[in-house]
Amino acid sequence: MTAPVERRVRVAAIQAEPVWNDLQGGVNKVISLLGDVGKEGANVVGFPEVFIPGYPWSIFTATPLDNAPFMEEYFHNSLAVDSDEMRRIQAAVKENGTFCVLGFSERYQGSLYISQVFINTDGQIVHHRRKTKPTHVERAYWGTGEGDSLKCVVDSPFGRIGGLNCWEHTQPLLRYYEYQQDVDIHVASWPVLWDRPESVGSRWPYFITGDMSSRLSQVMAFEGTCFVLVCTQVMSEENFDKNKVRDVEHIQGTGGGFSAIFGPGGEPIATMPSDKEGILYANVDVNDKLRAKQWLDVVGHYSRPDLLSLRVNTHPSKPVFFAEEPEK
């Protein structure tokens, strides 16, 4: 009889404050955090959404005209994939021997994208994807990902690693396609999102809270029978003015973090206070996913593809096509 072999992996979820609108400072902080997880022997680490150069809450709290100088600064402090800054991060990943999923605001030519790169232990970018649909007013500042960004899972020595950004987790079909890609460990990259004080009530939507976002991530762990690393930003009160949130009623003090690690049954493995910076660690057995799948496999034995199926277009759209040379 063949006994199952444990597949032990040490995972890490970042909860940290960005270096707001500071590309070099953000790169330095990522490198420092990679050093921390390397010392702790982490095999896989996830970072929050647009950790470089931070999530610009001012897009919600200021008019586009009032916010224009801030976003011009934001553009120039966003990170290009093909850049010396990214190569510094890749070198740090290699030095610390961890597989990294990094969330960042990507600058490409004249546009921005909400992006993730998957960097292996050799420091190579093995996948680069963009948020397929920026949320609400985000669409005024960031472009959309194309069909190639539907791929959100890559292989690694530590299992199959996946990742999505923020409200991509609300997209049932996108989640389903990730499950079909056989994800083992999923990085849920989120910005800073505060919970709603009782005194505010319905004046602030519950669906834009850390609590709701955490629940979405937990559902993905259960639904996809995978480990989920919830990685979030925090914002200190001293940075409220820079981010134009000082007068937002429900934002009360340093906080906005909700990092967590969930197991493939949806069970919480590790959590952290919302106002603290830190790194969550857990030693997990990737085979726990297979034990959970005995009960639930929504792309396998617990599916009905003869009744319900998903059509996927993974081909990237291009703004320019070249005609073939005419025959002479």
UniProtKB/Swiss-Prot annotation:
Domain of life: Eukaryota
Enzyme nomenclature, EC number: 3.5.5.1
Matching PROSITE patterns: CN_HYDROLASE, NITRIL_CHT_1, NITRIL_CHT_2
Catalytic residues of the enzyme: E49, K131, C166
One function term, GO molecular function aspect: nitrilase activity
Annotated CN hydrolase domain residues: 9-286
Keyword Cell inner membrane: no
Keyword annotations: Hydrolase
Residue ranges the record marks as coiled coil: none
Assigned protein family: Belongs to the carbon-nitrogen hydrolase superfamily. Nitrilase family.
Function text: Nitrilase that hydrolyzes preferentially 4-cyanopyridine. Is also able to hydrolyze some aliphatic nitriles, such as (R,S)-mandelonitrile.
Protein name: Nitrilase
